[in-house]
Amino acid sequence: MSILKMMLIYFAIFWVVNAAQLLDIDSQGVIPGAYIVVMKDRVSSLEFSSHVRWLKRTHRRNLAKRATPFTEGLGATWDIAGWQAYSGSFDEDTVQEILNHENVEFVEPNKEMQVASTIKQGNVTWGLSRISHKENSSHDYVSTYGEGENITFYGIDSGIDINQADFTGRARWGINLADHVDTDCNGHGTHTAGTVAGQKFGILKKASIVSIKILDCYGYGDITRYINGLNWAINDAKERGLLGKSVMNISLKTRRSRAVNEATVRAQEAGIFIAVAAGNQATSAEFYSPGSAPEVCTVGASTRNDTKAIFSNYGELGMSWSCILFYTTGTNVNHTVDLFAPGEYIRSTLPHNLTGLMSGTSMATPHVCGVGGLIMATEGLAPEKVCDRLKELANPTIQNPGFNTTNKLLYNGSGA
């Protein structure tokens, strides 16, 4: 074999090995033809801008070659604490060229996102009293960490009814990335916000509230809207001097997504404490995002009797088979539930000054978000340190938490 031929084979192998991966770990909820492209960490801002210009030229060239009416191309671009990525809709030829680009780490399909809760009925409200007492025997709420003064809460959800009386004029509309209805026409976002920051139903009773709408009236959105929401929140907090003094509740889910997990972690690194729902499929949270994201605080739902709610996802405390199988993709799936919080029959705010009961890890997560805000403000902790502190304070009282899963229940450290 000639030296030239050997060199050609070598470079062909090198090119294949170093090409970016197209991650299609799970096809459920995939939006056809829509993608998220994530750059390598070493890529500079100038290189990213150059890549975007290259992408636009490549997309136009391939459209002309195929004589196709398909024209969407580049969507949003993001830089979240150095995590650079973009969304868009591209033909197969363009996707292949993106995968072969030296600065691209991976590409994955855009997927649907939706609320992570189920609605139930009843006539009970008990969550606040439970998280403020070590023993499950009291019906009052006690807090020695204040009421969230100087904390800002960002709710990424179906929007928030900023005129809800329980928010006492502290809420403002941030951005609508879902539709043309600048209010919460689903109710999920207002309910979770009430548990975080309502005057009667919430923990951060004096915090500022910001609505980021990424889900429509039916509770559906997608990954692109989600990352747009994260990016907007980081920029807003930065402009207003709120980094290190903000919290975010994410009671949403999609099938496992490396892009969602990475963007969520980087958003917390930028300066916002983040609590995420484990999900309501009664299975391992490792199969869903952002519940499988490392470093952020993943929350399971507990009942009034301190058991794992029947619907709540759980999480293994070590390397799972899925983590081994998908290790080469770089997907972080060995991080799941950090602690539990009340998530069954939780009463909170709804649009139009109504209240209602909901159940789900969506309802548990706002409790952690709220207590996290109190701890961060009072103890001066960095956002990425808050979850560890919450786990230190938590009580090991959850019965039957799930296979190899923590038994820790959220506690606000009141001393009661």
From Swiss-Prot:
Propeptide section residues: 20-116
Lineage: Eukaryota, Fungi, Dikarya, Ascomycota, Pezizomycotina
PANTHER family associated with the record: CEREVISIN-RELATED (PTHR43806:SF11), PEPTIDASE S8 (PTHR43806)
GO BP, sorted A to Z: proteolysis
Family: Belongs to the peptidase S8 family.
CDD domains xrefs: Peptidases_S8_PCSK9_ProteinaseK_like
Peptidase S8 domain segment(s): 125-416
Protein name as it appears in the record: Subtilisin-like protease 12
Protein role: Secreted subtilisin-like serine protease with keratinolytic activity that contributes to pathogenicity.
Gene Ontology, cellular component aspect: extracellular region
Keywords from the UniProt entry: Glycoprotein, Hydrolase, Protease, Secreted, Serine protease, Signal, Virulence, Zymogen
